[in-house]
Structure formats: C-alpha cells, structure tokens
Amino acid sequence: MAYAWFLRWRRKDPAELERLRRLDVNTRGRISAGRIVDLVEGETAGSKSRLVVYSYEVAGVTYEAAQDVAALPEIAAMVQFLAGQTASVKYDPKQPANSIIACEHWSGLGLLSH
C-alpha cells in the first residue's frame, strides 16, 4: 500500500513535466504561422540540449519562444537546417505564450504526420 502511495505522489522529473506540457498544448492548441529564428545547442548537468528559437503572432502580439527538442530525436536531427524557415506553432489559446513547435505526435516543421 505504501508503495502505491509513493508512486501516486512522487514528484515528476522536469523531462516528464515538459513532455506532459507538450502533449497538453498539442491536445488543446491552436495553430499559428511562425518562423524559426535560431538553433542553440548546449549542455547542462550532463545532458545535451537543442533549443529551437521561434517567433509567432497571436492577436497582434508577437511572441518569441524556445523549445528543447533533444527529447524528440527525429526533430533534433533536422532543425539545424531550418533557421529562417516558416513553421507552424501550436499555442494554448488561454495562455498564448505557452507554445510548441513539435511534440511526440505533431510537428510544425512538416517532419511528422499531422
């Protein structure tokens, strides 16, 4: 019984929280046209990151965001060639700053089936 309680209440690690956020935005998100601004590669705490910096506009407000796509190998392999290209961005209509350029089931880069 105690083990079941632990599993239910254990803290999710940051990678799992980010995965859940991506899937949530994918489920309820609206699509807007965007542009890939840059790719920033780095390493923190022993893990590599691949940040795709992108911009998009919602209701006259321009947003610039970054998403680490290192957990999405198919996307991470292709983004180095996409700076300056247009892309689709999914954003949360209640919080337009909460957005994704790709997730496990969708890509605004045309690399996965929509």
Regions found by a protein language model. Give the residues of each.
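Oxidizing extracytosolic/periplasmic lumen-facing domains
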Residues: 2-114
